[in-house]
Amino acid sequence: MPVDKNLRDLEPGIHTDLEGRLTYGGYLRLDQLLSAQQPLSEPAHHDEMLFIIQHQTSELWLKLLAHELRAAIVHLQRDEVWQCRKVLARSKQVLRQLTEQWSVLETLTPSEYMGFRDVLGPSSGFQSLQYRYIEFLLGNKNPQMLQVFAYDPAGQARLREVLEAPSLYEEFLRYLARFGHAIPQQYQARDWTAAHVADDTLRPVFERIYENTDRYWREYSLCEDLVDVETQFQLWRFRHMRTVMRVIGFKRGTGGSSGVGFLQQALALTFFPELFDVRTSVGVDNRPPQGSADAGKR
């Protein structure tokens, strides 16, 4: 149907009798959502709205990411590989969205930010319960982080629950054990509150998978999905650190951290270390060469 005079007529079937019925705004509770942006600067600094919306939308994406990662864990517990891969694929896209979102905040200049930074007080993204929840789901367990949420007993309890449960990676290791891979017994039951650290006893398991991809295609595909998730998460961390550096330089963070230096430390944290370590040894013959002093000792 052509458009006349740059106007588009309402089609006869479009609902206009919406009194008392479910509407778009009602379903999404937009009255509540769009009234949650309340600048504290007086008079309201123009750029504080950007700062608020950046972080509020990040929290919405984090809520979805946590939802998907919890589902991935349940699918692994049920040996539902394809369903797990589906939600991991969505998780990767959510992380990509979170990463690209930093480009909006990067338009905030140092002088603009300093125009309202004081009103933030001690509040900081470091206090994001959902971010910490996701780190715990992925395996970056750290009981010390519970101290930050002492002011919020309900939130602290939520964090403690995921801290004390197997992470996504630990459930993956248990899945591998159920399918005959030589996963050490300690991964069936251990202190789940401790962060997973690189374990050389797991390397042969992943070497076997990566050197026999046709035979272990399901396991291999899940490994690569997890690598994708960690890679995208690290890109998000990196983009966060660079955005902070761009906006405040090397000032201390509002939450009391060293700022950029503290964020740089996060880049050294890893979720699935063996999935990266195995890349060094895949296809490499680690046996001593013939004629070497060690050749006859094997």
Curated annotation (Swiss-Prot):
One Gene Ontology BP term is:
L-tryptophan catabolic process to acetyl-CoA
- State what inhibits or activates this protein: Weakly inhibited by D-tryptophan.
Which cofactors does it use?
A: heme
Which Enzyme Commission numbers does its entry carry? 1.13.11.11
- EC class of the enzyme, as a word: oxidoreductase
User: Which amino acid positions bind heme, per UniProt?
Assistant: H240
Q: How many and how are cofactors bound here?
A: Binds 1 heme group per subunit.
Q: Which reaction does it catalyse?
A: L-tryptophan + O2 = N-formyl-L-kynurenine
Question: Which of this chain's residues are annotated to bind substrate?
Answer: F51, I52, I53, Q54, H55, Y113, R117, T254
Q: Name one GO molecular function term.
A: heme binding
Q: Does the keyword Oxidoreductase apply?
A: yes
The UniProt keyword set, sorted, is:
Dioxygenase, Heme, Iron, Metal-binding, Oxidoreductase, Tryptophan catabolism
Phosphoprotein keyword on record: no
The metabolic or biological pathway listed in the UniProt record of this protein is: Amino-acid degradation; L-tryptophan degradation via kynurenine pathway; L-kynurenine from L-tryptophan: step 1/2
- Oligomeric form and interacting partners: Homotetramer.
Provide the function of this protein.
Answer: Heme-dependent dioxygenase that catalyzes the oxidative cleavage of the L-tryptophan (L-Trp) pyrrole ring and converts L-tryptophan to N-formyl-L-kynurenine. Catalyzes the oxidative cleavage of the indole moiety.
PANTHER family found in the cross-reference section: TRYPTOPHAN 2,3-DIOXYGENASE
Q: What is this protein called?
A: Tryptophan 2,3-dioxygenase
